[in-house]
Amino acid sequence: MALNEVVISDSTTLISLLNIERFELLFNFSTIIIISQAVYNEVCYQPHAKTTLDGYIADERVSVKVVKNNERLQQLLIRLDLGESESILLAKKENLPLIIDEKKGRGIAVELGVKTIGLIGILLIFKKKSLLSDNEIIEIVDALRNVDFRVSEALLKFLLE
């Protein structure tokens, strides 16, 4: 059973988990993952990612929503990319938690009152709920590092404590 019914996600976590073939981990965190059209476009630049993501969309486990281009979006685009901006606005509008890993985007989301979590935070919750062992976490973090997802030794140590 997932820990959340529905969450919004930015692209980094999705791309990283698709690249290490562990996307299904997210469904332990949330039953349904909503993404913006811009995030869908960012994730689907690789054919294998598009195929996998489209499968989850067909199964209604991932949903794509269009975010209106308005003044609020334009203001966010001054500081963030389109995917992050749309994700933040979608999370704010739907009053749902946002999975976002970029520090700058997370800070802006928090300023706007959006509850955020990153991939490492999700792994920490999985550890506390005994959904992942230390060895599984080390395996996942090593795989993430191999696809250029940055995890410091200090953060890994904290995750394993």
Q: Residue ranges of each PLM-predicted region?
A:
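Active-site-proximal, substrate-binding regions of enzyme catalytic domains
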Residues: 2-96, 103, 114, 141, ...
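Short capping loops/turns at secondary-structure boundaries
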Residues: 98, 112, 130-133
